[in-house]
């Protein structure tokens, strides 16, 4: 019984720290107020393969690679990102030009690499 009490005391002492950590994280997300779009790169496709953005509205793209190193290149939005194998790259962008654009993987990732692209539509 006495072995449980020190463990329980330690656990109870840690709970406020855990709550403070969660509160801080939640506040940072709300304070940022920038929409996040998750994009997954996997041989030989991006998912989703189409997204729509608003001209002049800032958005954060969270680029994940599930397998090998990929690229994310889109000249009109001045994006040229490397997504290392098994990791995540974040980029913040504010589109200044309306239109429909094609982003490509510009890092050779295998035989069907040339077909790896996605459509990004920027609306007024």
Features from the language model and the residues they span:
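Bacterial N-terminal signal peptides that target proteins for export
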Residues: 2-15
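Cleavable N-terminal signal peptides
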Residues: 17-18, 29
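Edge beta-strand plus adjacent loop/short-helix module at the start
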Residues: 30-48
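Beta-strand cores of secreted/periplasmic/IMS beta-sandwich domains, seen most often
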Residues: 34-36, 49-68, 87-97, 122
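Beta-strand-rich interaction surfaces with strong enrichment in secreted/lumenal proteins
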Residues: 49-51, 78-82
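Extracellular/periplasmic metallocenter environments
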Residues: 85-124
């Amino acid at each position: 019984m006495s072995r449980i009490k020190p463990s329980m005391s330690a656990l109870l002492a840690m709970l406020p720290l855990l709550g403070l950590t969660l509160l801080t994280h939640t506040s940072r997300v709300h304070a940022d107020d920038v929409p996040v779009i998750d994009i997954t790169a996997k041989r030989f496709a991006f998912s989703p393969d189409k997204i729509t953005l608003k001209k002049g509205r800032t958005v954060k793209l969270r680029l994940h690679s599930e397998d090998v190193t990929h690229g994310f290149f889109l000249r009109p939005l001045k994006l040229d990102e490397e997504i290392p194998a098994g990791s995540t790259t974040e980029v913040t962008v504010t589109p200044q030009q309306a239109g429909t654009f094609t982003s490509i993987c510009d890092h050779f990732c295998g035989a069907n690499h040339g077909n790896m692209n996605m459509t990004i539509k920027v609306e007024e």
